[in-house]
Each structure stands twice: as C-alpha cells, then as structure tokens.
C-alpha cells in the first residue's frame, strides 16, 4: 500500500543521525534562494554565555538536561533562570525553512534523503512529546501557509457526484484563533480545540483532535473532508474519500508529520449554533474533604453529563463545560446538583446560554490565556464508560483522584470524547476506544 511505503521512507528521515556538512547546507540554501535559516533558542539573547553550536553529538543535546536554554515559564522576566548559566542548542533544530509552497518541502525531502539528515515538522509547536523539534534536524516550519477559505458547498476532488457541504480550508499555518474568528464572520461554526495558538491542520487533527463540541459532532478527524499533502517521495497528493483513500485513512489518526507535510486541510463546518455553558468553581482554599465530595459528585454525574452533550474541562474544584444540545432551563437542571454543592461551599456558579460557540471561546478561553506557564504532568489515560457503571469502578476512580489531590497535584480531565456522536466507526485511523469512552 502507498501509506506503508511512505511510512518506511519517512521513518528513515526521522531517525537519521545527520551527515550534512557545511557545503551541503550551503548548497541547500542556494537551491532555496537564500531561504535556509539558522535556528537558535528563543532565550539566547538573555544569556551572557551562548554555546549554541558547540555540541557535536546531537543525541547529547536531546538527552542532557544541562544542554538547554530556557527562561522561567511561570515568570519569563525573572533573571534567575539565566544567571550564571550557559545557553546551549538543546533540541532546537540546526536550520529551518519557512515553508511557503510545496516546492520547498520537496527540496527539503530531497536534501534529507541525500544527506541522511533528520526532518522535523513544526506547525505551532504544541507537541507534548517534542516531535516538532529535533537536535541536528532540518525543521520545516509551516506557519507561512496561511490559506483560509470558506465554501458553502464543497465537494472533494474526484468526488463529482457527491453532494456539497459547507467547509473551511485552512493552510497548515492557520491557528484556531484565526479560523474561529473567520468562521464567526462567515456565520458558521468551526469545531476545534481550546488553545488559540494551536494549529488547525497539524498534529491536533492528525492525532484525533478533540474539543468542547466533540461530544456531539465528533473528533477533528471525523470532520476532515480532504488533505493536500507532500509525501516523502516528493509528490503533492490530494487525499480524500475518492482518491488516495489509504493515505486519507492514515492521516486521520496516524499522528502529526507521520506521512508527510500537510499543506492544507478542508473541514466540514456547522451552522451557527447556540451553546449552553457551565462554569462552576470552588474557592482556592477549599479543604481536601470538600474536594473529595466534589470529585465523588462529578464521577457519579459523568455519564449523565456526557449523554447531555457536555464537553470541556473537569478538574478538582472546577468545571468548564459546554453543550449544544440543551436549552438554558435544561442546562440548569443538568448541572443543578453540582451548582448547589458549589454554592453551599462558597463557590461560584455561572450557567448561561450563549448565542454561538465563538462567544464561549472569547469569554472563557481567550480571557484565561496565560502569559507564562506552569508545571503540567500529562498522560493519555482514556477512561471507559464501564468504569462509571458500577460502584467498584467509581470507587477506584475516586481513590486515585483523592490520592492525586493529597500529594499536592491538581487532577483534571478533558471531557471531550465523542460520546453521543453518531458517526460511523473506523472510517479513519484513530484508536477505536475514542468511540466508547466516558472521559
């Protein structure tokens, strides 16, 4: 199959150690008409000692904790992060190309194959596993791919007899903030994630893609109609339900950058729709006992909330959920028990009906964007619905959440699996379990 051949080629690109010399890089820069750029860590100007290119073994940069160049994520202005510390290249690629067309990607692939240089692909850089970087690699940065187009009746290429649907095409450099604003202006709803700077056509969609509305309308991969991609053999391909079907299946779940570089993604959109929002929180000084009671209430309500279409974030002492299925009265009834509990314990409650998803996005997500950052331990636990269906399963969940709180952690879950989505299973390459998970 085409996809298995391409995967073999691309794995070689990703795992190569890199043998390119100065002459090779100069030749590539000439081929690209001067568009090859040297990459240095963002924070390097803050450091008095910059040794960005002293490391000769790329694996040392990737694994040695001292080979980094970081500011304090919680306070980027703090001088303590770089006082008496040397800045090193770390996992930042040696060189990068600001990709503006398919031709630049093809030239990069040809160079990588000839010199055995690793390729890293960066959209917005939101990759928990760091795959958008790579010591010694040639980085393909797709931010300049800024296509943004709305079509009221889109038909995928070579699907001439298929009925058209409303769709938006996003270049690989478009982020959610851009496409949400664009969709709002067109009077439609684009279904994506909650991070405004996350790319709409990158790793988010190719690893499944979930968000507030996924409960009802499916994952990002369920909504993709067509990809334009440069595969590692240097060919620009259109992948949809009518051509390159195996590649289309694989791109929807196979992970960001696995089969090539996405140039654009065309995604089905929905009409403008109202959304009920519940933002319920306990005070910051809430006791462990009250937090445990909150957790118990949430665990016992999870399946009901999922069936009502509520999607979003559920945490210890805080819930921010939205659903397009309920009226205001229905939403208040659905969340009544949690709301009453929060009020009894000095918490805040806001249950409201907003005119569309964009209003929820601008009111609750944009306003809570942090300038810095904080420590986060993420994991990929997917909790099946059956864990909530019996007392033993609920107790195990309760015990684990209570333990996390007791050791100073603030546990939270993304309640964004497609619990009530009615799409056909296994039309794409995502994990089967997405379809029957409670959380």
From Swiss-Prot:
What residue range is the signal peptide? 1-19
- UniProt key word Cell cycle: no
Family matches, as Gene3D superfamilies: 3.30.465.10
Which terms are listed as keywords in the entry? FAD, Flavoprotein, Glycoprotein, Oxidoreductase, Signal, Virulence
The record's annotation in Pfam families points to: FAD_binding_4
- GO molecular function term, any single one: oxidoreductase activity
Q: Which domain of life is it from?
A: Eukaryota
Where the record annotates domain FAD-binding PCMH-type, the positions are 89-272
Q: Does the keyword Zinc-finger apply?
A: no
Pathway per the UniProt entry: Mycotoxin biosynthesis
User: So what EC number does this one have?
Assistant: 1.-.-.-
What are the glycosylated positions?
29, 84, 285, 300
Cofactor(s) needed = FAD
Family membership noted in the UniProt record: Belongs to the oxygen-dependent FAD-linked oxidoreductase family.
What is the recorded function of this protein according to its Swiss-Prot or TrEMBL entry? FAD-linked oxidoreductase; part of the gene cluster that mediates the biosynthesis of the mycotoxins phomacins, leucine-derived cytochalasans with potent actin polymerization-inhibitory activities and monocot-specific antigerminative activities. The first step in the pathway is catalyzed by the hybrid PKS-NRPS phmA, assisted by the enoyl reductase phmE, that are responsible for fusion of the leucine precursor and the polyketide backbone to produce a 2-pyrrolidone intermediate.
Under what name is this protein listed?
Answer: FAD-linked oxidoreductase phmC
Underlying gene: phmC
């Amino acid at each position: 199959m085409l996809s298995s051949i391409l995967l073999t080629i691309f794995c070689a690109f990703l795992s190569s150690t890199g043998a390119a010399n100065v002459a090779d890089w100069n030749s590539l820069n000439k081929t690209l008409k001067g568009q090859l750029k040297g990459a240095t860590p963002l924070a390097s100007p803050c450091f008095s000692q910059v040794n960005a290119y002293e490391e000769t073994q790329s694996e040392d940069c990737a694994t040695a904790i001292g080979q980094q160049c970081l500011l304090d994520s919680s306070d980027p202005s703090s001088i303590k992060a770089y006082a008496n510390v040397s800045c090193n290249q770390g996992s930042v690629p040696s060189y990068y190309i600001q990709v503006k067309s398919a031709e630049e990607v093809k030239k990069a692939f040809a160079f990588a194959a000839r010199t055995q240089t690793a390729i890293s692909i960066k959209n917005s850089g939101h990759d928990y596993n760091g795959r958008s970087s790579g010591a010694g690699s040639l980085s393909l940065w797709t931010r300049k791919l800024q296509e943004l187009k709305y079509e009221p009746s889109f038909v995928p290429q070579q699907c001439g007899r298929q009925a058209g649907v409303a769709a938006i095409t996003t270049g690989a450099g478009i982020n959610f903030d851009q496409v949400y604003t664009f969709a709002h202006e067109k009077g439609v709803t684009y279904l994506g994630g909650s991070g405004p700077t996350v790319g709409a056509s990158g790793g988010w969609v190719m690893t499944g893609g979930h968000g507030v509305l996924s409960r009802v309308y499916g994952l990002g991969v369920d909504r993709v109609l067509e990809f334009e991609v440069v595969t590692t053999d240097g060919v620009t391909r259109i992948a949809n339900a009518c051509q390159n079907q195996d590649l289309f299946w694989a791109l929807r779940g196979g992970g960001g950058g696995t089969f090539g570089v996405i140039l654009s993604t065309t995604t089905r959109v929905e009409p403008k729709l109202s959304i009920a929002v519940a933002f319920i929180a306990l005070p910051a000084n809430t006791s462990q006992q009250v937090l445990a009671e909150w957790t118990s209430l949430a665990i016992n309500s999870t399946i009901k909330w999922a069936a009502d279409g509520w999607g979003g974030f559920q945490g210890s002492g805080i819930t921010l959920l939205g659903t397009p299925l309920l009226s205001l009265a229905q939403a208040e009834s659905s969340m009544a028990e949690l709301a009453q509990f929060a009020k009894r314990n000095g918490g805040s409650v806001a249950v409201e009906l907003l005119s569309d998803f964009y209003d929820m996005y601008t009111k609750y997500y944009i306003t809570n964007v942090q300038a810095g950052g904080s420590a986060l331990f993420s994991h990929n636990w997917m909790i099946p619905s059956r864990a909530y269906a019996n007392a033993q399963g609920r107790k195990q969940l309760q015990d684990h959440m209570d333990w996390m709180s007791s050791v100073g952690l603030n546990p939270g879950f993304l309640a964004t699996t497609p619990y009530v989505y009615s799409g056909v299973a296994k039309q794409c390459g995502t994990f089967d379990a997405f379809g029957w998970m409670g959380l």
